């Protein structure tokens, strides 16, 4: 399927088409850090001169702005971006968008492709799937983009979604830095918190942040910033609840101290890695930072990996893929093979993981394992005619057991880890929406697909 080579070919072919009075400008949305050298390869193989930029959220804001300004000013340019393309980055007008692999949600898809064609009023997007699974998801996204109300066996998710209390952690930090007195009181949080958040929960948040060393008790009924909060503020990490873990390591220029990026990986002195297409070497490190300098004449040991939450394909996208296959809402397909059976549930990553856990708990044999193949499919040790009866207690038990695994799917906010554990769990549970899962479970039916559908389903095994 498609990849970086296909993107280069597409850029070369598209360059020959008329573009009016403007030079052609591309943005490629992809997991840029997964490629060891996206910028050098594009520069080497493009059959025309073009400025090539790399943009992702873990870059320091100053470096991101430099990339945005450079792309906006260049007459012919390619910007290889991660999901930052959907966040409204200021990179000027874009003629075309290429997607190497599909984004997880319809909103992400529309935001990414919507960045292109604003000068002409015509959206031009090149979808490059790397597997039959991605091809099916692209087809589902394109279908939903034309008719964004999918047929689901249950009502759509509630709107607005449940409140994420991690916002209150970020707001506490921000209030403290804006406070003329340098202190925050419970009443300050009460003014910005939703009515459903009780005063007791607000006090728990403040006390927990104190125990973690971000706050300290001041005068009667007030809290002041402590050392760990000062360190976060110095790194400008307190002003948004969106993005990477605020406690991640900083990658800085070894001599100027300029912040370059964030990562969750500690490195040893002398190690080399690629960052934004540049080869860098670690020359010193301390508790929170890695000091780096440019390194020449040697291969990179690997590309720097960043702290990013894994994306989850949601229920509506997975159900749209089922619709593309010809299944009705709520239908599952069971395909027998030599090792057991494949259950194509089309429930997405989150509910697929919970379904696997529920079915696993129903098995008596300890050596019978239910495996998740992807967002649409489970491998079962044997077939089944229908799902076991719904068990509310078992569902709660499995959610609690799975929570460390599924929590990154829930987009709980970058300060979620600083909430009191009980409050953090309840916030995550609200995002799971067990009542909705129960509706989906009870409405499910299992069918044995005919031969043609069976072959199409087997292409989605991954």
What are these model-derived regions, one by one?
Residues 226-228, 348-349:
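Glycine-centered helix-coil hinge/cap
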Residues 134-208, 254-279, 284-462:
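C-terminal effector modules of nucleic-acid-centric enzymes and ribosome-associated factors
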Residues 69, 75, 241-267:
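Short, compositionally biased strand/turn segments
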Residues 228-256, 301-310:
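Short, amphipathic alpha-helical interaction segments positioned at domain boundaries
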Residues 1-179, 187-224:
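Helicase motor core with emphasis on the C-terminal RecA-like subdomain
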Residues 19, 242-245, 274:
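A short catalytic or substrate-binding loop motif that flags glycine-/basic-rich loops and adjacent residues
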Residues 221-227, 290-291:
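Minor-groove-contacting beta-hairpin "wing" of winged helix-turn-helix DNA-binding domains
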């Amino acid at each position: 399927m498609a990849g970086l080579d296909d993107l280069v070919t597409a850029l070369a072919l598209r360059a020959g088409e008329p573009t009016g009075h403007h030079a052609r400008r591309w943005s490629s949305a992809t997991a840029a850090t997964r490629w060891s050298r996206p910028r050098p390869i594009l520069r080497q193989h493009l059959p025309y001169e073009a400025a090539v930029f790399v943009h992702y959220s873990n870059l320091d804001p100053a470096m991101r702005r430099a990339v945005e300004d450079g792309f906006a000013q260049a007459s012919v340019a390619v910007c290889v971006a991660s999901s930052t393309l959907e966040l409204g980055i200021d990179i000027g007008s874009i003629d075309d968008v290429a997607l190497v692999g599909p984004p997880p949600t319809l909103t992400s898809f529309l935001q990414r492709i919507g960045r292109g064609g604003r000068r002409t009023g015509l959206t031009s997007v090149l979808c490059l799937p790397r597997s039959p699974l991605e091809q099916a998801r692209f087809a589902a996204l394109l279908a939903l983009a034309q008719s964004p109300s999918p047929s689901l066996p249950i009502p759509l998710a509630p709107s607005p979604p449940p409140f994420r209390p991690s916002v209150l952690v970020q707001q506490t930090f921000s209030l403290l830095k804006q406070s003329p007195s340098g202190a925050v009181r419970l009443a300050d949080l009460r003014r910005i918190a939703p009515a459903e958040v009780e005063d007791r929960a607000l006090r728990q948040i403040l006390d927990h942040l104190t125990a973690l060393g971000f706050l300290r008790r001041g005068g009667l009924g007030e809290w002041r910033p402590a050392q760990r909060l000062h360190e976060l503020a110095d790194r400008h990490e307190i002003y948004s609840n969106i993005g990477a873990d605020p406690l991640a390591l900083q990658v800085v220029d070894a001599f100027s101290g300029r912040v370059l990026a964030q990562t969750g990986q500690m490195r040893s002195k002398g190690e080399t890695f690629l960052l934004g297409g540049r080869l860098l070497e670690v020359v010193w490190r301390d508790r929170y930072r890695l000091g780096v300098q440019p390194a020449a004449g040697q291969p990179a040991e690997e590309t720097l990996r960043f702290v990013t939450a894994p994306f989850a394909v949601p229920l509506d996208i997975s159900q749209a893929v089922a619709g593309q296959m010809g299944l009705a809402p709520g239908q599952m397909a069971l395909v027998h093979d030599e090792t057991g059976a494949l259950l194509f549930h089309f429930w997405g990553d989150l509910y697929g993981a919970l379904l696997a856990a529920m079915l696993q708990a129903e098995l008596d044999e300890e050596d019978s394992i239910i495996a998740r193949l992807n967002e649409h499919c489970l491998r079962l040790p044997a077939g089944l005619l229908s799902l076991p009866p719904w068990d509310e207690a078992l569902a709660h038990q499995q959610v609690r057991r799975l929570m460390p695994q599924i929590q990154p799917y829930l987009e709980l906010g970058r300060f979620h880890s600083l909430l009191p554990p009980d409050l953090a769990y309840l916030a995550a549970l609200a995002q799971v929406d067990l009542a909705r899962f129960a509706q989906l479970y009870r409405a499910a039916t299992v069918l044995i697909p005919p031969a043609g559908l069976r072959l199409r389903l087997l292409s989605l095994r991954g």
